[in-house]
């Protein structure tokens, strides 16, 4: 029996060292308020995370600032056919909203008005107080029809739709939005002094006009089968002239395309609809800022004549459609 106890007992010197090490760990944990479970357990409770994050870093919620960050900075495709593939309809999922204090200026924003085949609306009206995203270089305004298989339109990648200082998980009808996420920044607490320093700059008068000093260009589209497997998108030049969009493109390309059609008098001269297609040889990604590093070397050798008629618009591939009450003659 004595030998059995000897196996369980620690030598006196080793026991002292082990006890000292245990006390050091306990005192170390109490000194820095770090939960011991963080070493072996990845699922921490909220209180443990608060102790870990907030000590000497966050002393007040006033140090937290919410910022809206746009997705287009990641280099995602921003043309309407590509963007609409990232959105889908779902039923039975309640929408969620969160406010934010500051945001970026967006290159591309979207504004949707989609109806079902029976004439009913696909998208809900925005709640009271919700306004469109205020800083957009291009607003892609899309009107059309679709099956809309669900109650609300969500982002398939889990991102938010950014409105004016409000982010929502759903798209609201006729309200301009940008795609993005919400980030929370922890600002260092300013040191308190007993005297008040003189401000470095005089206060600047602000305005409630969210569109001041920022030029916004609206591009219009017509879309059919929105929310379906295969959708069709037309760029609207005027009420009777359209361009079929079959490839990813940039808003700058559409602006130049619009100018080319008008400058060369290629608009519909009747009450019928005239639809053009773009020559496949033309690169539609001119001016894309997200790919500037890969494209900037090509600009000095690119001839802008490629965007002039007839190279950018192929008259032999044009699609002519007649609307009721008028014929659309072929352009020469």
Curated annotation (Swiss-Prot):
It is found in: Secreted. It holds the Pfam family Filo_glycop. GO terms for cellular component: extracellular region. The keyword Secreted applies. Glycans are attached at residues 41, 205, 239, 258, 269. The keyword rRNA-binding does not apply. Keywords: Disulfide bond, Glycoprotein, Secreted, Signal. Residues 1-33 form the signal peptide. Disulfide bonds join 109-136, 122-148. Belongs to the filoviruses glycoprotein family. This is Super small secreted glycoprotein. It comes from Reston ebolavirus (strain Philippines-96) (REBOV). The gene is GP.
């Amino acid at each position: 029996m004595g030998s059995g106890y000897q196996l369980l007992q620690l030598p006196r010197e080793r026991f002292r060292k082990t006890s000292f090490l245990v006390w050091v760990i306990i005192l170390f944990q109490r000194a820095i308020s770090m939960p011991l479970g963080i070493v072996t357990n990845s699922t921490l409770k909220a209180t443990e995370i608060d102790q870990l994050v907030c000590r000497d870093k966050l002393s007040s919620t006033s140090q937290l600032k919410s910022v809206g960050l746009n997705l287009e900075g990641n280099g995602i495709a921003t043309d309407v056919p590509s963007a609409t593939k990232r959105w889908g309809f779902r039923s039975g999922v309640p929408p969620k909203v969160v406010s934010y204090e500051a945001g970026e200026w967006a290159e591309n924003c979207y504004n949707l008005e989609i109806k079902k085949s029976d004439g009913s609306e696909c998208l809900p009206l925005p709640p009271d107080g919700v306004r469109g995203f205020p800083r957009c270089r291009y607003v892609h305004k899309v009107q059309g029809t679709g099956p809309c298989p669900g109650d609300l339109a969500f982002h398939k990648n889990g991102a938010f739709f950014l409105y004016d200082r409000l982010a929502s998980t759903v798209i609201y009808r006729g309200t301009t939005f940008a795609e993005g996420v919400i980030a929370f920044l922890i600002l260092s607490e300013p040191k308190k002094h007993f005297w008040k320093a003189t401000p470095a700059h005089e206060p600047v008068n602000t305005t409630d006009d969210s569109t001041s000093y920022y030029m916004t260009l609206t591009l219009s589209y017509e879309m059919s089968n929105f929310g379906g497997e295969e959708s069709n998108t037309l760029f609207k030049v005027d009420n009777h002239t359209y361009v079929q969009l079959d490839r990813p493109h940039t808003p700058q390309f559409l602006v130049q395309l619009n100018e080319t059609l008008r400058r060369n008098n290629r608009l519909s001269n009747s009450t019928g609809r005239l639809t053009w297609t773009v020559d496949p040889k033309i690169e539609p990604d001119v001016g894309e800022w997200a790919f500037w590093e890969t494209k900037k070397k090509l600009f000095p050798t690119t001839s802008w004549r490629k965007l002039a008629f007839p190279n950018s618009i192929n008259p032999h591939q044009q699609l002519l459609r007649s609307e009721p009450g008028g014929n659309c003659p072929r352009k020469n």
